[in-house]
Amino acid sequence: MTEYKPTVRLATRDDVPRAVRTLAAAFADYPATRHTVDPDRHIERVTELQELFLTRVGLDIGKVWVADDGAAVAVWTTPESVEAGAVFAEIGPRMAELSGSRLAAQQQMEGLLAPHRPKEPAWFLATVGVSPDHQGKGLGSAVVLPGVEAAERAGVPAFLETSAPRNLPFYERLGFTVTADVEVPEGPRTWCMTRKPGA
């Protein structure tokens, strides 16, 4: 039997509708999302949040890869994403509205995680998801690897945060190690993970 090889490429604006559906489905029940996004119209809110990350962060100032035409999506910021602060300042009010009744929890979680983020230039995996009906085919690693490889070529770390314990071995196989284990009061335990160059 031949091994399945996903088709991975940089995303375009044409990929947005399917990529947003993929990310929304992947994050609908994700622990951090459940903790920080209002349960009222939850999937609609998650969908819009993921669209903001995909379009305003990934496509506008970062890098986005899709596998199999959007069945898997990875959104990265890079050391060249110098406009990130301005973009987050612009979309921040809408993100706060989407958090709704969970805004205080979102702000608390952000405050707990921020000190563990790299101060030096790094590739930051802002969001990644695989469509539930395409999981287990290697699309996750296929869509994350281009960013990992770009960080390696640049000689800078790659960084991510996850609140799903099942994700830890997946990222460890890609060379990431846990650099912080953050207990969020009344929320999900969250791990910061870094992949140093040469890992």
UniProtKB/Swiss-Prot annotation:
Molecular function GO labels: acyltransferase activity, transferring groups other than amino-acyl groups
Keyword Acyltransferase: yes
Presence of keyword Acyltransferase: yes
GO BP, sorted A to Z: response to antibiotic
Broad enzyme group: transferase
UniProt xrefs under SUPFAM superfamilies: Acyl-CoA N-acyltransferases (Nat)
InterPro entries named among the record's database cross-references: Acyl_CoA_acyltransferase (IPR016181), GNAT_dom (IPR000182), Trichothecene_AcTrans (IPR052523)
Pfam families: Acetyltransf_1
EC code: 2.3.-.-
Alphabetically ordered keywords of this record: Acyltransferase, Antibiotic resistance, Transferase
Domain N-acetyltransferase: 6-198
Function of the protein: Detoxification of puromycin.
Protein name: Puromycin N-acetyltransferase
Highest classification ranks of the organism: Bacteria, Bacillati, Actinomycetota, Actinomycetes, Kitasatosporales
Gene that specifies this protein: pac
